Amino acid sequence: MTRLAPVARLTQYAHGAGCASKIPPAELERVVAGLTGGGDDLVAGGADGDDAAVLRIEGGRAVVSTADFSTPVVDDAYDWGRVAAANALSDVYAIGGEPLMALNLLGWPRDLLPAELAREVLRGGRDVAALAGCAIAGGHSVDDPEPKYGMAVTGVADPDRLLRLDAGRPGVPLSLTKPLGVGVLNARHKATGQVFPQAVETMTALNADAGLAALERGIVCATDVTGFGLLGHLYKLARASGVTAVVDASAVRYLDGARTAVRHGFVPGGTRRNLSWVSPHTEFRRIAEEERLLLADAQISGGLLIAGEIPGAPVIGELVARGRRTLVVR
């Protein structure tokens, strides 16, 4: 099917780009403090901030539920739909589940952008959901000053074989399945219109195989790297697990052009807020500011951060016994 010819730069209709528009993590934690909870059958999704909620049901199974939506990260409507869908589905894979059904979540400025463009966004989401074997069963839409799109996803999992945020143990290596840098590249794209195909490719890639590989190897701890950056999500994992996480900065992969984007000042506000949040909990050993920003870069549809090793994913550090700081970057 031929794509709709662009009539507008979608990123110009949003104040921020994708997951970089998240409410700052420290502020969000204050807002939701004491408001989460559930019965004994809610085995994930409580105060630790797991990637998805998991509810145990009969027959040794569990229902997985999550929702994610964002503002545009790219100007191409179809690609934005693909990115947003992959990002929403990722939370199911990150906790060890299989997505079954999704509902579209769409906010659209009807007086500013044509309905045909919204259709392209939905088509992109549909195509990625189809790759995941996930049915789309309608959804919800609102007239919104800013375009927003994402999905509420329902899946299934074995409640006794989950990838949990709080299951990290000392002596386990850390692996990361995708390169970092989409946040700063998306910021450059928003400012200049320059397209970064490698960034689009990594953002639209599903984390299905990585999640399955982790389960097959008996791994029990993982999360995905999205709006809070590598350091933010690793901090949450290490804090929940009661360990210290050590990152070997030289082992972390970055997309082509990411360092240049930082040097030219294309750093999202969300990335800077991430770094401010984790810095008091992090021991940086001779790590330059540029490197710190990249490690905290706000991602969308990032890779899985796994406490363990799977084929094709570089080891970027390890978990050790809890020390003075929750994170160490060397």
Locations of regions flagged by a protein language model:
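Glycine-/charge-enriched secondary-structure boundary and capping motifs
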Residues: M1-G16, E27-R30, R110-A135, V142-Y149, ...
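N-terminal glycine-rich phosphate/pyrophosphate-binding loops that anchor nucleotide-derived ligands
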Residues: T2-A94, C134, R169-S175, P314, ...
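A generic local secondary-structure boundary/capping motif
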Residues: L42-A44, A52-L55, S90-Y93, G125-R126, ...
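Acidic-glycine-rich active-site phosphate/pyrophosphate-binding loop
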Residues: A53-S65, T204-A210, L275-R285
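Short beta-strand-to-turn element immediately C-terminal to the catalytic PLP-Schiff-base lysine
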Residues: L55-R56, T154, T177, A307-G308, ...
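Glycine-rich anion-binding loops of enzyme active sites
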Residues: I57-V74, R82, E98-A191, V195, ...
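Small-aliphatic-rich amphipathic alpha-helix that forms the alpha element of a beta-alpha
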Residues: A77-L103, E120-L131, L206-R217, L230-L237
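Active-site glycine-rich loop that binds ribose-phosphate moieties when present
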Residues: A152-L162, Q194-A214, E289
